[in-house]
């Protein structure tokens, strides 16, 4: 904000802006055509249509230069970048093709993820929040069908051994709270050695604000041989817009897109935290990670209503969102009302399925 203010003051006064006053952090920002980047890092930024770090382009030349009044901003559709800047912003990029997959033992799919983390200095609750924006880019040459995007959180609230989690589907919210009034599995002490909050226990929430955009589906079921598949007048580009997900064929309206919210909320537990079955443990292989993302337990069993959500047998009600009740209401389904005990839960707020095309 000091940089923005200083540039504006120089501009209003009709005097040259002192480029030496620009903080190094702004000159190191990885935005398109940053002329100072190579001075610090001795290599050039890639030239890419995605543009890397988003910024406000003061003179509209498509190039980032803080000495010309440019500054980092939040890339958000429908929001002008000029007024959409936080007090602090961090940008980073990672991909799944640069090294071996030691957690999943899976194969790379050439997915790039660009992340903006940012925060605001305010006098209200926003001061206690941090925000994260993720951009997923398919760098492969083929589309990825049945894509799921998930926010994974290991929400250790002080001592991890006495945590419960829940979800509020009306807000796409995950929250973690303590099992009782003291943080710790032995009074205010924790067997893992973690520092506890003792009798000043907070609550943490992760809000899934917005999901990815996907083409609107005009028809949700088709059979092979359906005459509409041959109707080139009603669907002139039909063979370019077919999508098959979970054995169902869709026609996609590529001119209109809808926002996909949180389609499932799942959790799993650390092995050794309680005596829970192996189907509820942390994933170890690529298919197990995918199952949690797509709303199933580690072994493919669907989540069901009540208890821990792992209820094998006929008559169980299949669900997409686990523990959705208010912990303060014993008649609602929550980990508190189910009295689940020790488990150290980790959560997944997911969106899908959708098709992610290259680029």
Q: Can you name each region flagged by the protein language model?
A:
Residues 1-358:
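Extracellular/surface-associated beta-sandwich interaction domains
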């Amino acid at each position: 904000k000091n940089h923005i203010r200083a540039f504006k003051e120089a501009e209003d006064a009709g005097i040259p802006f002192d480029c030496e006053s620009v903080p190094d952090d702004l000159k190191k920002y990885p935005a398109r055509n940053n002329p100072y980047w190579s001075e610090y890092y001795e290599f050039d930024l890639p030239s890419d249509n995605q543009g890397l770090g988003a910024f406000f382009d003061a003179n509209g030349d498509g190039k980032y230069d803080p000495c010309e009044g440019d500054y980092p901003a939040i890339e958000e559709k429908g929001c002008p970048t000029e007024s959409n800047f936080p007090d602090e912003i961090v940008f980073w990029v990672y991909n799944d093709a640069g090294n071996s997959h030691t957690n999943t033992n899976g194969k790379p799919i050439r997915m790039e993820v660009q992340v903006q983390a940012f925060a605001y200095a305010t006098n209200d609750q926003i001061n206690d929040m941090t925000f994260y924006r993720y951009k997923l880019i398919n760098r492969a040459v083929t589309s990825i069908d049945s894509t799921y995007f998930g926010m994974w959180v290991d929400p250790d609230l002080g001592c991890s051994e006495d945590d419960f989690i829940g979800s509020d589907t009306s807000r796409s919210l995950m929250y973690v709270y303590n099992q009782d009034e003291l943080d710790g599995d032995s009074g205010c002490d924790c067997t893992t050695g973690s520092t506890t909050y003792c009798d000043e226990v907070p609550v943490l929430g992760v809000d899934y604000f917005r999901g990815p955009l996907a083409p609107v589906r005009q028809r949700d079921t088709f059979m092979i041989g359906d005459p509409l598949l041959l109707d080139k007048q009603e669907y002139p580009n039909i063979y370019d817009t077919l999508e098959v997900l979970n054995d169902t064929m869709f026609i996609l309206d590529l001119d209109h897109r809808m926002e996909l919210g949180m389609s499932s909320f799942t959790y799993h537990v650390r092995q050794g935290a309680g005596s829970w079955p192996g189907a509820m443990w942390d994933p170890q292989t690529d298919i197990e990670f995918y199952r949690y993302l797509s709303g199933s337990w580690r072994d493919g069993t669907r989540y069901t209503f009540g208890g821990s959500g792992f209820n094998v047998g006929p008559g169980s009600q299949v669900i997409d969102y686990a523990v959705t009740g208010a912990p303060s209401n014993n008649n609602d389904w929550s980990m508190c009302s189910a009295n689940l005990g020790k488990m150290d839960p980790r959560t997944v707020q997911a969106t899908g399925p959708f098709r992610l095309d290259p680029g």
